[in-house]
């Protein structure tokens, strides 16, 4: 996922990773 490889997004949306 793009979000999971983007640290700020991953931090804000851990449930998708």
Swiss-Prot record:
Expressed in which tissues: Expressed by the venom duct.
Predominant cellular place of this UniProt entry's protein: secreted
Subcellular location: Secreted
Modified residues (Cysteine amide): 17
Modified residues (Pyrrolidone carboxylic acid (Glu)): 1
PROSITE patterns, per database record: ALPHA_CONOTOXIN (PS60014)
GO terms for MF: acetylcholine receptor inhibitor activity; ion channel regulator activity; toxin activity
Disulfide-bonded cysteines: 3-9, 4-17
Chain spans, region Ser-Xaa-Pro motif, crucial for potent interaction with nAChR: 5-7
UniProt keyword Secreted, yes or no: yes
Modified residues (4-hydroxyproline): 8, 14
Post-translational modification: Exists in 4 forms due to different PTMs (In1907, In1891, In1874, and In1857).
GO cellular component: extracellular region; host cell postsynaptic membrane
Alphabetical keyword list: Acetylcholine receptor inhibiting toxin, Amidation, Disulfide bond, Hydroxylation, Ion channel impairing toxin, Neurotoxin, Postsynaptic neurotoxin, Pyrrolidone carboxylic acid, Secreted, Toxin
Protein role: Alpha-conotoxins act on postsynaptic membranes, they bind to the nicotinic acetylcholine receptors (nAChR) and thus inhibit them.
Domain comment in the entry: The cysteine framework is I (CC-C-C). Alpha4/7 pattern.
Family according to the record: Belongs to the conotoxin A superfamily.
Name under which the protein is recorded: Alpha-conotoxin In1907
